[in-house]
Amino acid sequence: MESGTVLLESKSSPLNLLHEMHELRLLGHLCDVTVSIENQGVHEDFMAHKAVLAATSKFFKEVFLNEKSADGTRTNVYLNEVQAVDFASFLEFVYTAKVRVEEDRVQQMLEVAEKLKCLDLSETCLQLKKQMLESVLLELQNFSESQEVEASSGPQVSVTPSSKASVPGEDAHSNGLVDSSDYPIERLGNGLSPETPSKKCKEKLDKKKDVAKPPFPKIRRASGRLAGKKVFVEIPKKKYTRRLREQQKSAEEAAENDKCPQDQSPDNERMETEPAAKSEACPASVELEESLQKVEGEKEEEEGKDGEEKKKSNFQCTVCDKAFLYEKSFLKHIKYHHGVATEVVYRCDTCGQTFANRCNLKSHQRHVHSSERHFPCEMCAKKFKRKKDVKRHVLQVHEGGGERHRCGQCGKGLSSKTALRLHERTHTGDKPYGCTKCDAKFSQPSALKTHLRVHTGERPFVCDECGARFTQNHMLIYHKRCHTGERPFMCETCGKSFASKEYLKHHNRIHTGSKPFKCEVCLRTFAQRNSLYQHIKVHTGERPYCCDQCGKQFTQVNALQRHHRIHTGEKPYMCNACGRTFTDKSTLRRHTSIHDKNTPWKSFLVIVDGSPKNDEGHKTEQPDDEYASPKLSDRLLSFGENSHFNNLLEVQGNVPAVQENSSTGAACKAVVSQDALLTTSISALGELTPQAVSMPAHLPSLTNME
């Protein structure tokens, strides 16, 4: 005999499952996706589970199913149209099926639900907005009734029947409301005496009195949530108000049909149908109607508006002639109603540069073209463009930076105890985090995580402007400043701004004269570590960069780039004082000293776009001034890292000009002595050797540029 089947069903299992998934997310366990929110300069990462997001949001489901990589590694999703606080509430809802938000954020959560295509959250928001609207309608109705009760001097009042119909399924007596069908209704007009109510209406009134109900019950608030505080009403969109009107109209018609029997006199029928007309004149109804029309006018401009309102409508649909005040509403309309997908170009009106989104455009306009500084420091009255610049200024200048957490060995100040503990590992050499694929070890887990991307080739951070990919998020942030032109880090000494804090730190060594990096071979010091690395190649003889046209090798990539300009003839750097062009900045910098010796810091640099220009006919502003040949000076400066060029003495006696192929095509003259010219001619302008330094004492050296 076969046994029957039984159904094993647990009602608590879904709730327990959600609870456990929520706990796993909070602890960061088994999370396989990171959602990065970057909106209005605020960046925040949220860890979650793909399965939960895909099950609750069609947007994430499409993203994850369309992924090319199915290796199970953690992926990153970037959202820039959602605020971090709204997405945090969204995550709490999908993991717990509930979330507590402020009343004025319900509309924001509805928009987030529509963007992420979360039907459950969307339905919840719509239901809540409907309840809020119904409570507001009851509030307005109660207020109008209380005003009528106070103003009425007779024992009978007219009550609009729409109050009961506005909240279907709710008992009006339980809320202390008056049922208009149970009380006689009078209308005074044109000096006529009031009509006598019907007998059946009187009987109903007597029955109500027998229940010990006062003829004018005390009107109280229909919603305990609204009692005792001022209500800020957010009227919903047009489709919800239209639906509410239809429900209200159908309820009024039903109230008119059921109010009195068909055998009543025409006078009573007229008397029973007049409350509908009177309800139109009710102050609450008029006020509600005006508010609804006002909201409809804000959401969707209608054809009957005057000239001023039409001017405010900046965007108009050519298909249905609807006008919109905001570009976002217009683009959403043509996309969902007419199926037109447009590509929006965010372009700066000042410089014409384009951006991927509006946030980058506003950031560019605010920090590049605008010189306004609205945020002053309370201690020194210095002004800044952003609030966080003020905070950083106060911390670094007035509060002594990281003095509160200072390293006992090197004296470096850190911003927190955690940063101090990690910094101390640089002295102890403790590196507890080792790579499983190589022998590399690190003192911080984040450094190990970044290192592993070298083996996997993962570059999860993508620039939406040019498509460049990076292994770390801060590298992407620095890169984006190349597109926006933002330079938020300013030098407190000279006011120069930089795109990254590292560049500012390198720049500050110019003012302090600090050169912490020393070569162990020749004991020469450098301000930057990269400069030391490049210098070490002088001792090792390493020249990894080779010219593909002539085979010459170089120690630095920028030296190879300068060398390439010899073959191409490109001279992209022009002096804005005399128009002369040069192949590199260093030659231009030496040249500009002839224009203004007293201000060596002044920049005459102009970067020339396109192909090299023919600069024939360009001469210096002072034709009597003669300056050294760039080619000769370049060779001299290449010796000994420019260490001897400043020691050259000025001698008397001019010689004929030394011809060279300069950017102007004109002859350049050098102020040298006869013996110096003879010496350079013998060496054929070759590269000087250490023996050349020990030349006879009677041979003077080259002079200054003049």
UniProtKB/Swiss-Prot annotation:
BP-aspect Gene Ontology terms: branching involved in ureteric bud morphogenesis; negative regulation of DNA-templated transcription; negative regulation of transcription by RNA polymerase II
Zinc-finger ranges (C2H2-type): 315-337, 346-369, 375-398, 405-427, 433-455, 461-483, 489-511, 517-539, 545-567, 573-595
SMART domains, per database record: BTB (SM00225), ZnF_C2H2 (SM00355)
First and last residue of the signal peptide: none
SUPFAM superfamilies: beta-beta-alpha zinc fingers, POZ domain
UniProt entry tagged with the keyword DNA-binding: yes
Location relative to the cell: Nucleus; Cytoplasm; Nucleus, Nucleolus
Subunit structure: Interacts with NCL.
Protein name listed in UniProt: GDNF-inducible zinc finger protein 1
UniProt source species: Mus musculus
Lineage: Eukaryota, Metazoa, Chordata, Craniata, Vertebrata
Underlying gene: Gzf1
